[in-house]
């Protein structure tokens, strides 16, 4: 046996539910769209959000916590999260001091995070700045 998979279509939801139940003291799972947030919403600081394709757990969700991410948006296996996931996560953790998206340099991640940033600027009048650093 190489993998523990009940149903292929449920793998992301089951994985997130398992992670959230094991770390219920730290994170809250939001479904439809899928994203996780810190239990203790940070106040008076810039909200930090990241995400990316699932399949490398606990890559994004494992960085949620004090002094680290406020939210993580896991996409499907090796697929970028949707702009709707990022928008919902941003709305959940925004504390009035701005939002910083940490984006890895994958075309889908860059495109979808940029779309989410544009949606935020239109729907919530949150200013938008862009910085790209090739690493």
Model-derived segments and spans:
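N-terminal amphipathic/basic leader segments beginning at the initiator methionine
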Residues: 1-48
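Glycine-rich, flexible N-terminal cofactor/catalytic loop recognition
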Residues: 34-66, 73
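Glycine-rich phosphate/diphosphate-binding loops that line cofactor/substrate pockets in enzymes
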Residues: 35-44, 87-97
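Gly/Ser/Thr-rich loops at beta-strand to alpha-helix junctions
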Residues: 53-58, 104-113
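Glycine-rich oxoanion-binding loops at beta->alpha junctions
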Residues: 56, 60-96, 132
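A short, small-residue-rich loop immediately preceding and capping a beta-strand
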Residues: 97-104
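Short Gly/Thr/Asp-enriched flexible loops that form oxyanion-binding sites at enzyme active sites
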Residues: 110-123
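Residue-level detector of conserved catalytic or cofactor/ligand-binding positions
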Residues: 125-135
């Amino acid at each position: 046996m190489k993998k523990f998979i009940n149903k292929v279509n449920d793998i992301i939801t089951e994985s997130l539910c398992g992670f959230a139940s094991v770390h219920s003291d730290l994170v809250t799972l939001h479904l439809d769209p899928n994203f996780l947030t810190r239990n203790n919403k940070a106040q008076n600081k810039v909200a930090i959000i990241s995400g990316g394709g699932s399949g490398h757990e606990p890559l994004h969700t494992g960085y949620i916590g004090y002094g680290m991410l406020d939210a993580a948006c896991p996409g499907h296996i090796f697929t970028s999260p949707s702009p709707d996931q990022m928008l919902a996560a941003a709305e959940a953790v925004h504390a009035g001091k701005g939002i910083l998206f940490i984006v890895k340099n994958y075309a889908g991640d860059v495109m979808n995070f940029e779309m989410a940033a544009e949606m935020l600027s239109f729907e919530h009048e949150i200013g938008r700045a862009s910085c790209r650093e090739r690493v």
